[in-house]
Amino acid sequence: MKSTALFLVFLWIHLTAGAQNTFPYSFNTNSVYITLVGGCTQVAALQLPDPVLTPENIEALNVETINKFDRNATRQFSPLANTQSDYTLGIVMVAPSAIAASELGRSGWNHALIYSGMYLETFLLTNGVKDLTKDIVQRTRPLFYNSDLSLDERAVLAAAGDGRTSFYSGHTAVAFSSAVFLASTYDELYDNKTVSRALWTSSIGLATATGYLRFKAGKHFPSDILTGAIIGTAIGYWVPKAHLSGTKNWTLTPGTNSLTLQYHLR
């Protein structure tokens, strides 16, 4: 919690002190498409049966079936790394709230709501695609191949219900989508190359640390983590680009007790 607070304070200081560009984002038809795709993938994932890993499944696992690139993950297991990955993910996930708060202070609700809406779309799409892929692929997590853990220990871990959700890494995907969203939107909103470099380095560093910790925890193979990083990066970069004002069709107007969303025909 302390590290999260320090990161946000650092970001807030530089946001309030930096020169701001014209706000370039708006709601448009892409907002509808992104929300629909994210929502539909999430609903589709909920319709699929939860993948179950039984003690018989665990006993039948053979590490020799794992490719050499991924095999080292079957020797990893660390509850501490698992917990730490939640912390690093949490820090990078909440960081965009500093920019939303800055927009609220500078320009009022309209810009803050648009920025927050873009971030929610990013999370919805990242999470929906991830959940659907996990339920379709049903790859067993590497820790269940780990012979240093007894069959009983692995059976207890499998009882949590996520033993076959290895591909791909959701923590890594969300961390990278949040990190790239944060840094790329900062570049559009502020003219400060020094802070930009620091922000890219720190946010991508946290996302990379999240992926590494998922590996050390025995939760994911390297290919799971690499895939999550690529997909998260793509979504985190593309969603805000899809909201640049050149494609403006929607306007969100806050009222005293309401919000009005208007569509403009071209």
Which residues does each PLM region occupy?
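Hydrophobic alpha-helical transmembrane segments of multi-pass membrane proteins
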Residues: A81-Q84, S116, L120, S169
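Generic beta-strand or strand-like secondary-structure segments
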Residues: M93-A100, Y115, G128, L132
